[in-house]
């Protein structure tokens, strides 16, 4: 399973991904995104942590406007 970075305010997404067997890392700073296959951010404060510019190998998913299920589907597609 993938290592997924999730902003700390997205607790429902964190729980859903853990139930699917993914390793979930809480994103508190740009360094937390290192080594993640994919990162999920709220999108409310665009690029507040600099993750959009970070050199992570995975993609960044913006959760704004998506349900928890839709976010989980995006993770499955992108990882």
From Swiss-Prot:
Highest taxon listed in the record's lineage: Bacteria
InterPro entries to which the protein is assigned, alphabetical: UPF0180 (IPR005370)
A Pfam family hit: UPF0180
Similarity annotation: Belongs to the UPF0180 family.
Protein name, UniProt field: UPF0180 protein BCG9842_B3897
The species this protein was found in: Bacillus cereus (strain G9842)
């Amino acid at each position: 399973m993938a290592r997924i970075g999730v902003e700390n305010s997205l607790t429902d997404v964190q729980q859903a991904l853990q139930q699917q067997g993914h390793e979930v890392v809480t994103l508190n700073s740009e360094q937390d995104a290192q080594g993640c296959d994919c990162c999920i951010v709220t999108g409310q404060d665009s690029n507040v942590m600099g993750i959009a510019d970070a050199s992570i190998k995975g993609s960044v998913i913006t959760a704004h406007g998506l349900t928890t299920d839709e976010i989980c589907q995006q993770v499955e597609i992108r990882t």
